[in-house]
Swiss-Prot record:
Component of a multi-subunit COQ enzyme complex, composed of at least COQ3, COQ4, COQ5, COQ6, COQ7 and COQ9. Its main location: mitochondrion. It catalyses: a 4-hydroxy-3-methoxy-5-(all-trans-polyprenyl)benzoate + H(+) = a 2-methoxy-6-(all-trans-polyprenyl)phenol + CO2. The gene is COQ4. The lineage of its organism: Eukaryota, Fungi, Dikarya, Ascomycota, Saccharomycotina. This is Ubiquinone biosynthesis protein COQ4, mitochondrial.
């Protein structure tokens, strides 16, 4: 019995020693692993090779929209403010702005969008060739002047002699209550130089009004649009000349068709390319001499014709 008890204690002691050895060995191995890993982490930190995952990475990632894949990638802008459009987008802009321009021609946003959606590349390339083939046109493309009330110095123009282009222009602005600062920048034409050519056309529009004396009432706008279309071939003025009269009164259409359309056809075809006129450098020129040099005849005064028409109506009603 005594020997059995001694043997049992001996076995228990051996087992306890074995467990202690195993625990010690495991602790040593685990500690060595941790120490080795810490050494590796420290080494990586020292070499700049350690990178932790950013928990906010998913929030900082740029959202990828369906339109940004290889089939619908948006082109890069070609100049400040440029908005590249797909063909279908430009077509939808044409439809929307066309309807808006017909029913609400007083909304300038419709006119602007219609103009740029119909400013097709072949027409703009033709104007570009005209400018490149002319020394003044080349100078305009090289210098790229912009027309604002500051660049034109309207106060200086008011002080010029009455027979000058500058005084005629600023007098027309004052009479009609408009400003050269209202011309919005081109956004939807893809080529930078073509965009400038259309911007130039847009900013010169008031000079066409000034040298012809036509007001900004709808009949005057249509007449100037016909002149622009016949001279430069830009589509939007042609569409305006074709469709805008449909909303006019019979008396207005009669004036346009009998007086101002024939004048605009004749002047537009006979005049020199208006896109090549450096208006800013002609401000001190005699306006009548300028008209002759350009080949533009001045049409009958539209406001006077309207006054005469309404006076006649008033007289007939009294009778």
């Amino acid at each position: 019995m005594i020997s059995r008890s001694i043997f049992s204690k001996s076995v228990s002691l051996q087992r306890s020693q074995n467990r202690s050895f195993l625990l010690t060995a495991a602790s040593a191995v685990f500690g060595s692993m941790i120490f080795n890993e810490n050494n590796q982490l420290a080494s990586k930190m020292e070499r700049g090779e350690l990178h932790y995952d950013d928990p906010n990475a998913s929030l900082n990632e740029k959202k990828v929209s369906p339109a940004s894949n290889k089939y619908f990638s948006r082109r890069e802008s070609e100049y400040p403010g440029h908005v590249p459009l797909y063909g279908i987008e430009k077509f939808m802009m044409f439809i929307g702005s066309g309807l808006g321009s017909f029913f609400h021609p007083e909304n300038n946003a419709n006119i602007v969008a219609l103009g740029e959606s119909t400013a097709i590349e072949p027409v703009l390339r033709k104007l570009q060739r005209q400018m490149l083939s002319d020394p003044v046109g080349r100078q305009i493309l090289r210098e790229k002047p912009r027309m604002t009330s500051t660049s034109l110095n309207l106060d200086h123009l008011r002080a010029l002699p009455k027979n000058t282009l500058g005084h005629t222009y600023v007098s027309w602005l004052d009479r009609e209550g408009v400003s050269p600062d209202t011309r919005v920048p081109v956004r939807f034409i893809d080529n930078e130089e073509l965009a400038y050519i259309y911007q130039r056309y847009r900013e010169c529009h008031d000079f066409y009004h000034a040298i012809t004396g036509l007001p900004i009432i709808i009949e005057g706008e249509i007449a100037v649009k016909v002149l622009e279309f016949m001279n430069m071939g830009i589509l939007m003025p042609g569409l305006g000349a074709l469709l805008a009269p449909l909303r006019l009164k019979p008396s207005q259409r009669e004036r346009l068709y009998s007086i101002y359309y024939p004048w605009a056809f004749r002047s537009g075809l006979n005049a020199k390319p208006l896109i090549n006129v450096y208006w800013e450098k002609s401000l001190e020129m005699d306006v009548n001499e300028l008209r002759r040099s350009l080949g533009i005849e001045q049409p009958p005064d539209l406001r006077n014709l309207r006054k005469e028409y309404f006076a006649k109506l008033k007289k007939e009603k009294r009778i």
